[in-house]
UniProtKB/Swiss-Prot annotation:
It is a multi-pass membrane protein. Phosphorylated by host kinases. The gene is tir. NCBIfam families: transloc_TIR. It is found in: Secreted; Host cell membrane. Interacts with intimin and host proteins. Disruption phenotype: In a rabbit ligated ileal loop model, mutants do not induce formation of A/E lesions. It holds the Pfam family Tir_receptor_N. Residues 1-37, 184-204, 279-299, 313-347, 380-449 are annotated as: Disordered. One of its GO terms (cellular component) is extracellular region. This is Translocated intimin receptor Tir.
């Protein structure tokens, strides 16, 4: 493959003579045969520039590349490390971002520009900050991913192989994470996604969400009904007391009575004095004394008959006063008794109705609240949510070529086993992270084949969330050899054709990935333009 060396190799400190060109059978960039090979690294590993497409002199209107997000012509180069394994050439990205990814793992980092014009990427892990200097190609690639200029990115794991760290914008990974959470949250609904074109690789997804939960005691309407009944009873008692104090007949005063004997004596004495006074005014009512000369002189004493008459009239007046006193006392007592009886009747009626009903309401509300609380304590089940998700994958007939999973030395996986491996059971998840923290839901997707079998249930969820964006294909190879190659591109387009061609020509070997081969039709296949949003993974 025609290459251009970066000029240094951080893995080799000793001076090494220039290496000869790599075998011509691995030349996958046939359109760049006129480029010179300059290398001062070892034969097994060296840093280089690799042309992404057929030639760097492609037409200016060709905006697609095998790696979404890289700038268009003439900057379509990737800083890589090439390793020779037998007759197969395997490429790895090597640069500041790889150094930073090795230090901080799959986490957030930011890009800053220093005063001297250099660009640095800064990440943090376990309280330690790591800073690396970015090359112009790396900085341009990151700029193409971040048109908004937020300069915050996330390593999303080795999606294309253990040696290649994928990068996306932090806001995009947060959006993708939220979409995954939304997919996992139960909504007590049944969703069915019918399969699309049988040859498109789309699957039939059936989701059944069953949520069983018991509301808290405070959310039970029966409790609030009981409390409202108690409140109504208390209000009724207060209203009854106010009505008895204001609206009912007032309590009568004690009756005013007069002693009949005292009234008779008083009246008799008064009448006697009055009659005696009137009798003295008439001289005929007085006794007469005859003096020496024979003249009649009043003696100043009333005659006996007049005195008797006065006494009789005074006695009659006293008796009349006695009767009047007795009658007055009787009327006063009768009035008191009537008013008191009326008040007692009103009090009895109001107390029986007002306090009785209010007391019954309070008692009923208290019993209802107690029973409701007891039932909640007795019948409170553990809140549980069951989410059943069945994925039936309709594999196309040419699945090996479309997915790029051809294994030239291992047994072919049957469609039935692939469908069975895609059936999964997922339970709901909760989001307790703050908005300032970006968690990476794709951090564990770049795992070996044997580890992926235990967690195969997670991949359909991620693939469903990113059904339409440009995701890189995950390459899993059998055997004990480590996965050292990388594969980047858009599923279903040029990159799969490349792998199909390499598999048929023997360029793809067991346990190794990479872009190798000897045809021009594969590498010249145009891919779709990068999709904006959380799909931009490189």
């Amino acid at each position: 493959m025609p290459i251009g060396n970066l000029g240094h190799n951080p893995n080799v400190r000793a001076l090494i003579p220039p290496a000869p060109p790599l075998p011509s059978q691995t030349d996958g960039a046939g359109g760049a045969r006129n480029q010179l090979i300059n290398s001062n690294g070892p034969m097994g590993s060296r840093l280089l520039f690799t042309p992404i497409r057929n030639s760097v002199a492609d037409a200016a209107d060709s905006r697609a590349s095998d790696i979404p997000g890289l700038p268009t012509n003439p900057l379509r180069f990737a800083a890589s490390e090439v390793s020779l394994h037998g007759a197969l050439e395997v490429l790895h990205d090597k640069g500041g971002l790889d150094t930073l990814n090795s230090a901080i793992g799959s986490s957030l980092f930011r890009v800053e520009t220093r005063d001297d014009g250099s660009h640095v990427a800064i990440g943090q892990k376990n309280g330690l900050e790591t800073t690396v200097v970015l090359s112009e190609q790396e900085f341009s690639s990151l700029q193409s991913l971040d048109p908004e200029g937020k300069n915050k990115f996330v390593f999303t794991g080795g999606r294309g192989g253990a040696g290649h760290a994928m990068v996306t914008v932090a806001s995009d990974i947060a959006e993708a994470r939220q979409r995954i959470i939304d997919k996992l949250e139960p909504k007590d609904t049944k969703e069915t996604k019918e399969p699309g074109d049988p040859n498109s690789g789309e699957g039939k997804i059936i989701e059944i969400h069953t949520s069983t939960s018991t509301s808290s005691l405070r959310a039970d309407p029966k409790l609030w009904l009981s409390l409202g009944t108690i409140a109504a009873g208390l209000i009724g008692m207060a209203a009854t007391g106010i009505a008895q104090a204001v609206a009912l007949t007032p309590e009568p005063d004690d009756p005013i009575t007069t002693d009949p004997d005292a009234a008779a004596n008083t009246a008799e004495a008064a009448a006697k004095d009055q009659l005696t006074k009137e009798a003295f005014q008439n001289p005929d009512n007085q006794k007469v004394n005859i003096d020496e000369n024979g003249n009649a002189i009043p003696s100043g004493e009333l005659k006996d008959d007049v005195v008797a008459q006065i006494a009789e009239q005074a006695k009659a007046a006293g008796e009349q006063a006695r009767q009047e006193a007795i009658e007055s006392n009787s009327q006063a007592q009768q009035k008191y008794d009537e008013q008191h009886a009326k008040r007692e009747q009103e009090m009895s009626l109001s107390s029986g109705v007002g306090y009785g009903i209010s007391g019954a309401l309070i008692l009923g509300g208290g019993i209802g609240a107690g029973v409701t609380a007891a039932l909640h304590r007795k019948n409170q089940p553990a809140e549980q949510t069951i989410t059943t998700r069945t994925v039936v994958d309709n594999q196309p007939t040419n699945n090996a070529s479309a997915q790029g999973n051809t294994d030239t030395s291992g047994p072919e996986e049957s469609p039935a086993s692939r469908r069975n491996s895609n059936a999964s059971l997922a339970s709901n998840g909760s989001d307790t992270s703050s908005t300032g923290t970006v968690e990476n839901p794709y951090a564990d997707v770049g795992m070996p084949r044997n580890d992926s079998l235990a967690r195969i249930s997670e991949e359909p969820i991620y693939d469903e969330v990113a059904a339409d964006p440009n995701y890189s294909v995950i390459q899993h190879f059998s055997g004990n050899s480590p996965v050292t190659g990388r594969l980047v591109g858009t599923p279903g387009q040029g990159i799969q054709s490349t792998y199909a061609l390499l598999a048929s020509s023997g360029g793809l070997r067991l346990g190794m990935g990479g872009l190798t081969g000897g045809g021009e039709s594969a590498v010249s296949t145009a891919n779709a333009a990068p999709t904006p949003g959380p799909a931009r993974f490189v």
